[in-house]
Each structure stands twice: as C-alpha cells, then as structure tokens.
Design a protein with these regions (language model features):
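Conserved catalytic motifs of ABC-family nucleotide-binding domains
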Residues: 155
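Conserved ABC transporter NBD signature motif
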Residues: 57-65
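Short helical segment in ABC ATPase nucleotide-binding domains corresponding to the A-loop/adjacent helical element
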Residues: 97-105, 115
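Helix-to-loop junction immediately C-terminal to a conserved catalytic motif
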Residues: 49
Length: 219
C-alpha cells in the first residue's frame, strides 16, 4: 500500500525534516508513527497525501508513484485516502452532517445515502445532536470528532491520522480507536501519528519511531 525509498524532505537551506526514510506498509496494516515533536511525523503524512512533494526519493501509494502524478492524478488518488490533520479543515459554511458527507458527495452518492451514512458516523461519535449545526458552534474537541467521522464515512483504502485523539478524554479516545480498529478490520490501511506513549502501550501494533527525521526503530 505504501512504499518510501530514500525519501528526504528539506525546506530551503535548513536541516532536512526527513532524511533518507525507507518504509513499507502493507495493505491492511495498522501502524503507529511515533517520535518527539519535530521528528517529522506530520511531514511524512503530508507527503503520503501529496500535500507536499519530497525533495528526493520516491513514494508509492497504492502502487502509484506520487512523484509522477499529473495535476489531475492527485485528486483521483485522494479519493481513496482519508486524512485527519490537526487543523481539521472543516467547511465553515456547511453543517456538521454536510462536512462529514462531503467525501461521499464528491463520489456522486445520492443525498439519502450521504445523509444516512453521515448520521450513523456522527451517532457513533456522540455528535448526532450536532448534525445540523455549523462547525463554529462546536468546541475544539467536537470539531476533532467531526473530522474523524468525515475520514471514516467513505471507508477509504488508506487513512492517515495526525494525533487524532490529542485533545480528547480517555473515554472518547477509546471510542475513536475502536472505530479506527474496526475500519482496519474491514480492510482500511491505517497510519496514526502520535507521541502518546500510553496509547502505544495499551494498544500494541507495529510502531515506527522517528527522531530528527530518521526512522530509528520499526517493531
């Protein structure tokens, strides 16, 4: 599903954020991506989503070389990838339910199908009562859960999540991880970036550790 070959990412003359990273993630795997702040976790996820391009090296996602994608090829690839980044990127002029269902709308699903799937995801995350609210009326934690519901609604081939439980209490954290594990059991490849050591201890999965832009362990 994911292959990185000698990937380096640098900005200007600064030290590389990622340096000579080699990584392989098989289809259907669940992996933790961990390391201290500034280790390169978010940058790696952004490269996988084609939000940025590597300075050198090659990246394959779903068998496609992202370095060689045309301008039209990036949106096509992203149809099979869902992301949860720390800035959430909710649409301010759309309701919560419309935000969640946006990926299905892009795929051409019917209004009834979109509404039903969106409400089910919101119900799983305790946000059914907020379905017709605008994002500005929600707390930061609620907005975070909306972003997670949006990422899961279309059952993507690949889910990339950057600190998806960072601002949530233990109960909500467990609920969200159950949803991520369920998506993984259904075939979604899941990559979750976190610096929460307690999560890694409680939910043991393959863990790739970064430090100063390099992979220092993979177990």
């Amino acid at each position: 599903m994911i292959q990185l070959f000698h990937v380096t990412k640098a900005y200007g003359g600064d030290a590389p954020v990622l340096s000579d990273v080699n990584l392989r993630v098989e289809k259907g795997e669940f992996i933790w991506l961990t390391g201290p702040s500034g280790a390169g976790k978010t940058t790696l996820l952004r490269l996988l989503f084609c939000a940025e391009a590597p300075t050198s090296g090659q990246i394959l996602v779903g068998g496609r070389n992202v370095n060689r994608l045309s301008q039209g090829g990036v949106p096509y690839l992203r149809r099979n990838i869902s992301v949860v980044f720390q800035d959430f990127k909710l649409l301010d002029n759309r309701t919560v339910a419309e935000n969640v269902g946006f990926a299905l709308e892009v795929l051409g699903a019917s209004d009834a199908h979109i509404r039903g799937r969106s409400l089910r995801r919101l119900d799983q995350l305790g946000l059914r009562s907020k379905a017709d609210s605008l994002p500005a009326r929600l707390s930061g934690g609620e907005q975070q859960r909306v972003a997670i519901a949006r990422a899961l609604v279309n059952e993507p081939a690949l889910l990339l999540a950057d600190e998806p439980t960072g601002n949530l209490d233990a109960s909500l954290t467990d609920s969200i991880l159950e949803l991520l594990f369920d998506a993984n059991a259904r075939g979604t490849t899941v990559v979750v970036a976190t610096h929460d050591r307690a999560l890694l201890s409680r939910y043991r999965r393959r863990t790739v550790s970064l430090d100063r832009g390099k992979v220092v362990s993979d177990a």
